[in-house]
C-alpha cells in the first residue's frame, strides 16, 4: 500500500511555469513556429470550418484553428472570455494558433 501511495504522489511530470503563463496576441505573433502558447480573449468571429478570429484584451487579433473535438464541453459566444492553449503555426505569409484546448475563464 505504501508503494501505491508513493507512486501516486510521484505521478505527474515536469511542468514549466512558462507554458501556463498567458501572453498577448502581439507576443504570440513574434514567437517561432511550434512555440507553446496560452492566450486569453474572445472569439471575435467565425471565419470558416474550424477557423476563428480571436481577440485579446489589447484588441489584437489572430486566427485560431479549433477542431470540434478540442472544444470539449465548452460553449462560447462573442462575449465569453476564453483561455486557449496551443501552438504557433507559421507559414510564409500567415501566423495562426493550432489550439489544443479551450476553457472558459471564470
How would you describe each model-predicted region?
Residues 1-7:
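Bacterial N-terminal signal peptides
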Residues 7-106:
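OB-fold and OB-like single-stranded nucleic-acid-recognition modules
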Amino acid at each position: 500500500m505504501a508503494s501505491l501511495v508513493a507512486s501516486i504522489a510521484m505521478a505527474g511530470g515536469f511542468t514549466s511555469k512558462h507554458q501556463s503563463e498567458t501572453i498577448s496576441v502581439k507576443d504570440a505573433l513574434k514567437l517561432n513556429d511550434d512555440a507553446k502558447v496560452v492566450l486569453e480573449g474572445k472569439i471575435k468571429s467565425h471565419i470558416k470550418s474550424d477557423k476563428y478570429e480571436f481577440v485579446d484584451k489589447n484588441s489584437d487579433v489572430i486566427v485560431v484553428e479549433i477542431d470540434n473535438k478540442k472544444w470539449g464541453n465548452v460553449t462560447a459566444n462573442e462575449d465569453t472570455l476564453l483561455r486557449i492553449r496551443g501552438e504557433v503555426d507559421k507559414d510564409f505569409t500567415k501566423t495562426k494558433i493550432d489550439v489544443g484546448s479551450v476553457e472558459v475563464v471564470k
